[in-house]
Amino acid sequence: MSFKKDDKVTFVIEDIGTGGEGIGKVDGYTLFVKDAIIGDKIEAKIIKAKKNYGYARLEKIIEASSDRVTPACPVARQCGGCQIQQMSYQAQLRFKEKLVDDNLKRIGKIEGYEFFPAIGMEEPFRYRNKAQYPVGTAKDGSIVMGFYAGRTHSIISCTDCKIGAVENQYILAVIKSWMEFNGVAPYDEQTGKGLVRHVLIRTGFHTDEIMVCLVINGTKMSDKLKESLVGRLTEVSLDSDISTDKCIKSIMLNFNTENTNVILGRQCETLWGKSYIEDYIGDIKYQISPLSFFQVNPRQTEKLYGKALEYAGLTGNETVWDLYCGIGTISLFLAKNARKVYGVEIVPQAIEDAKNNAAINGIDNAEFFVGKAEEVVPHFYEEMARLAADTSATEAQREEARKSITPDVVVVDPPRKGCDESLLDTIVKMSPERIVYVSCDSATLARDLGLLAAKGYKTVKVQPVDQFSHTVHVESVALILKEQPAID
């Protein structure tokens, strides 16, 4: 039977896609349906029909799945942030476990590993320490703040995101009132005019410090507007609506005049307070600027990094490489338990932050390099290999060079695209006993584990960690051991 656009069909959802879409079949024809979950019997309208599969819009739930819940957020269906808020949290964890395990087996052809249930959150709401709200103009001419609808740049009004900090809504209300009172226009993507593009709010969950950063379409703002903004925001930090334990410690401007989807520009100005806030992961203190990369769920990050530290098996004598180290979040965790840690990150500002974070924590056994890991590590390996063989160098220099290129442990925490194969080749050449792979995409994790398996490294344990409830994203930590050659 063939199907075409606008056909209405009734069927049961049997699976969930990687984007959170419900998947079902009608007479063998596969349909993907946003907002539907496993077990739902639905009526849907086909919006795009291809030869072997199509996409449909959920029209009516005839019989709800036992895992279906009412989303806490009233705009969950329109907003592009939470794809699976309509699933119970336990069902979300099961979905993520299955996603990781299936990818390892299907893509990586990985077998014989110990797979653990996902580490979930005690409270799967209010977990994000960072929110970036686009600012625009509604059809009636009023100022709108919120989030983009899925796959669009249409702003859905939402100032109380249920996975963000509760304080954000009150801060946004003050900024909106300030804009209205002073005639400050929102940025218009079509014309390139208007001043305020985004509002960035960062919260220190362990320190209760808040940063507010206005991203503006310009390189300056009048002193009168600055003083007015600071006056209003410093008052809101004492507002009864906000927990008295939390207050604004930093008010910043960020300048972005580019016609781009990138939210932040390169330059910032401190209007009031500090140019950063502080927070902790475990007992490591971090300074966080508007431009800093910092994990958005610090409570789950402690569990994630704790598992990485456990898998690293450090005793205090090891040499460790941390590739894609960011601002040193994992590096500094490891450094307290290792002889020496080397970190590599492509973003220069992140390396400056890493060095600063090492200094404020009194950590002197971590060294950081700027550049692409797939370029820095092979180059460093060749350079240190020459030094290790250089008879004109001191024995201490040669020994340190040997240790640096024969690490006991390598930790990788790559972006979603995973590791470059040339980097994996160099890691294998370094011959560490252990590789700890922290992944934000189980498909590329599976691919890379398959490549490592072909080079003599066996995946032993895999632990999913839910960092982002109500979304389809899941982190994983894998322990990979060097296989010992068989003894005849």
Regions found by a protein language model. Name each.
Residues 59-66, 70-71, 77-186, 206:
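Extended interfacial segments that mediate partner engagement and assembly in macromolecular machines
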Residues 155-197, 218-252:
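Internal alpha/beta scaffold segment
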Residues 201, 208-217, 285-289, 409:
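Short, aliphatic-rich beta-strand segments
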Residues 116-124, 189-190, 197-198, 202, ...:
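Short, solvent-exposed loop/turn elements at beta->coil junctions and helix N-caps
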Residues 22-27, 146-149, 213-215, 354:
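Short, acidic/hydrophobic/Gly-rich beta-strand patch recurrent on exposed beta strands
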Residues 2-7, 18, 220-227, 231-488:
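Rossmann-like S-adenosyl-L-methionine
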Residues 45-49, 134-138, 202-206, 481:
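Short beta-strand micro-motifs enriched in acidic
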Residues 1-71, 75, 367, 375:
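Terminal RNA-binding accessory module
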